[in-house]
Amino acid sequence: LSFTLNDGDFVTVIGGNGAGKSTMLNLIAGVYTADAGSIVLDGADITKLPEYKRAKLLGRVFQDPMMGTAGNMGIEENLAMAYRRGRTRTLRWGISNEEREFYKEKLQRLDLGLEGRLTSKVRLLSGGQRQALTLLMATLQNPRLLLLDEHTAALDPKTAHKVLTLTEKITSENRLSTLM
């Protein structure tokens, strides 16, 4: 398989169950090791790069709304983890007022009322709210490539439509290259 994605491209891969769509995304993310060939991102061969190092370059939203977030942590804590991904860690964990305002502004754009619930545990959110939060977390740092693994499959049709609309809005505003 060989393909090229340009900046801002949104490509949807279509195939039946077991066709290898999720496997392809897992290969790109570094979950699986490629037997042959190479994976090149922005001209750099990332084939041998470990998954945790690829995480700096990639955003990812899974099919299961429970994945991608820490359910026992608050909304702002989840956002802080995503925002700080790939950065040097310090002993300080607190969230500054500036960061909190940044998160509120980002959450407001989702139009789900989450900006007033920053300390709410993520496990208390609906599947659609959680998936929208995961999408926001995956795109906070403007990744080089956004991987969406059937991210609306577990949602009801109305909620799936809302999440897809948010996906289109976020990816087009940030010119994110996206593989779904």
Enumerate the language-model features and the residues they cover.
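Helix-to-loop junction immediately C-terminal to a conserved catalytic motif
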Residues: 29
